[in-house]
Amino acid sequence: MTTTGPAALLARLTSPGAPAFAVLHRRTPRLAPDTVEVLLGTVGSHDTLADLPVRTGLPADGPRHDLLALVPYRQIRERGFEAHDDATPLQALAVEEQYAFPLADLLAALPQQPVRLEGGGFDIDDEEYAGIVRRVIEDEIGNGEGANFVIRRDFRARLDGFTTGTALTLLRRLLEQERGAYWTFLVHTGDRVLVGASPEVHVRQSGGTVVMNPISGTYRYPAGGSDLDSLLAFLHDPKELEELTMVVDEELKMMCTVGDLGGQVLGPRLKEMAHLAHTEYELRGRTSLDVREVLKETMFAATVTGSPVQNATRVIKRYEHGGRGYYSGALALIGRGASGGQQLDSPICIRTADVDPATGELVVRVGATLVRHSDPYSEVAETHAKAAGVLAAIGARPGPARSGGTVDGGGGAAGGGARRLADDHRVQAALDARRAGLAP
């Protein structure tokens, strides 16, 4: 890591001829809290995950990042599964420079420019999406094609006068407004911009340990903010319990493949964010596999496809009329530890705005998890809630309501001292009761 200050670096990134770059705020055990990393380099495209140029050997100056890969959903065809081919490229930023700053210092340097939004709306309206939900429940789940499926819809708009400064402004807003995100990030490849706040680990690997983090079940905060009664009702809702149980079961299958040396299940836990909360588990295993093989065998999480995953890809292809781009794919930060061992940190690419920097055209893709007990209009509301964080950042939705029952929890820049609802003993008891349903 070098010592260039954040203001000078951001001035460089907003100048003509700036290199491709990424700004990452990651919640990972290997990184000091409230650290933001900035990576600069060159971008290349690759056909398969095996083609990613993963480096080996001892790094010269201690642990370092070598590569940031953008893995599109269409890459799931490497596993023999179906997907619309929308030609979204598997790209990788080869890291040539890397910097780390305290979050507060970076926020002080990030721009606060006006964001001008033109148009804006879902490509599939609420009634049409509710109709799709009904058909999937009746024709797919009802006929035994699978236990749950995630069907997306797209919010599309245009950011007038879009520049790199606009992208950095959106990142600033997400850092300030969102909480509980695993990664809050901006990636600018030159011809594509991704800016988002993903709550969910796709897969993490270090020192032979591999971690997955299935998240499912969505508690949408009431208009006045979260409260204990509505949270407990959510935790005791059979539909929400069913969602989480099914995706954990599916991702345990993946863990049995990549965690070839054994593993364990931790949780469930509550993940509180700005507009909603989720229930989650953590799966841990020991692996002997290369990071590229781990990425391949975990394409893609049941939480963003469905279960069984292979059947889910067929249902997705039937009900979604085009490709998913990077939605439900992954970002993958690959590097080496001080001893030369492989390191991987990969979030699922959700809650993300995908922007064409040449035109300002923007798409935010979101989906709801459909199970046999799903209510179509509740699933419509779930897509609105999942999009809310990014849409608030671009000015298409109001910012989050704050509640005395939750605290920032370290996700957003503005901290707080209030007690989290997850710390209440009744919430913990409800979460513990869910674990009783897992096989020992």
Please report, for each region that a protein language model flagged, where it lies by residue.
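Short acidic, Gly/Ser-rich segments with clustered Asp/Glu that frequently serve as metal-coordination loops
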Residues: D139, E240-T257, L266-R269
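A short, Trp-centered hydrophobic/proline-enriched beta-strand micro-motif
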Residues: A18-R27, A147, A181-V187
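Non-catalytic accessory segments adjacent to catalytic cores
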Residues: T28, T42-G165, G207, E240-E242, ...
